[in-house]
UniProtKB/Swiss-Prot annotation:
GO MF annotations, alphabetized: methyltransferase activity
Broad enzyme group: transferase
UniProt keyword annotation of Membrane present: no
Protein name per the record: Putative S-adenosyl-L-methionine-dependent methyltransferase MMAR_0955
EC numbers: 2.1.1.-
Pfam family, one: LCM
Length: 313
């Protein structure tokens, strides 16, 4: 389903369904023998919505017809779980480092099914603001409440579309822009047009003071590469054709239709220009650092995103 200017979605639709895919990877990592992260709530979300393509990571075996045309698919899925686990660990550590250093306000942009407000050991007095579409936040809170889960911090849900005036909504929810804060933008950039990305950062700039921090999963150098896009599209069309025959109930989202393939300013450069200290870690380096490097056969199928960490001077 192609994007429109004011589109919205249920958790099983469009951008919402991609959050279930991330939850599936986190659940798979949590079940693994030596998990890098622990997200006990990821499987709770999957159980709440029932069967779908997002459950592939928990399937005992992929369809034989699928493995016949994509023999490396299990390795690719394993690599994506490792990518998501590394990404999750990066943001977990970023938030905990900042809050343990005395920052008392955390803001999660496009929170999706992120359960950090429930699962991380936040310092006493920390307030976590979660921003996302109303139906996504409602589903998350209701599902976790049904399972008796309680936030481990002062969680504040800010139900707002990031294309709207979310800074006003954030301030009205109790956010104090006069004291340091820590922010995340994880899994968000491809869903924003270039102009919206700039506006997002400008708004963060207007809500932060010295010593504030932000971590961003930025688009990597191959995001716009036409050959990379063509290869991914062809591979996914082969998979869709098989799945339409053997498991038609598992519709595979056309992710490329949800993303904005536009030239945009490098995220690290943007924050440097606006007086932030910046470090950038390529995804391959991040994964290797966690001992989760992708297998050579499929390393070209793992996102080449950049993990940006910045602190305002």
């Amino acid at each position: 389903m192609a994007r429109t200017e004011d589109d919205s979605w249920e958790i099983t639709e469009s951008v919402g369904a991609t959050a279930l895919g991330v939850a599936s990877a986190r659940a798979a990592e949590t079940r693994s023998q030596h998990p890098l992260i622990s997200d006990p709530f990821a499987q709770v979300f999957l159980d709440a919505v029932g069967d779908g393509v997002w459950n592939w990571h928990s399937a005992p075996q992929l369809p034989a017809e699928l493995l016949e045309i994509e023999p490396d698919l299990p390795l690719q899925m394993e690599a994506m779980v490792s990518y998501m686990a590394s990404r999750t660990a990066f943001f977990d550590e970023f938030f905990l480092d900042a809050t343990r250093a005395g920052i008392g306000q955390a803001v999660i942009l496009a929170a999706g099914l992120d359960s950090r407000a429930w699962r991380l050991p936040w310092p006493a007095g920390t307030t976590v603001f979660e921003l996302d579409q109303p139906r996504v936040l409602e589903f998350k809170a209701a599902t976790l409440a049904e399972h008796g889960a309680e936030p481990a911090c002062g969680r504040v849900a800010v139900a707002v579309d990031l294309r709207q005036d979310w800074p006003t909504a954030l301030r009205q929810a109790g956010f104090d822009p006069s004291v340091p804060s820590v922010w995340s933008a994880e899994g968000l950039m491809p869903y924003l047009p270039a102009v919206a990305q700039d506006l997002l950062f400008e708004r963060v700039q207007g809500l932060t003071v010295r010593a504030s921090r932000i971590a961003v999963e930025a688009l990597g150098p191959k995001f716009l590469d036409p050959q990379v896009r063509a290869n991914r599209s062809a591979r996914m069309e082969r998979i869709r054709a098989v799945m339409a025959h053997v498991e038609p109930q598992r519709e595979i989202p056309r992710t490329d239709e949800l993303w904005y393939f536009e030239e945009r300013e490098d995220v690290g450069d943007w924050f440097r220009r606006h007086d932030w200290d910046v470090t950038v870690t390529p995804s391959g380096e991040l994964m290797a650092g966690y001992g989760r490097a992708a297998a050579a056969q499929v390393e070209d199928r793992v996102p080449t995103n950049l993990f940006v960490a910045a602190q305002r001077k």
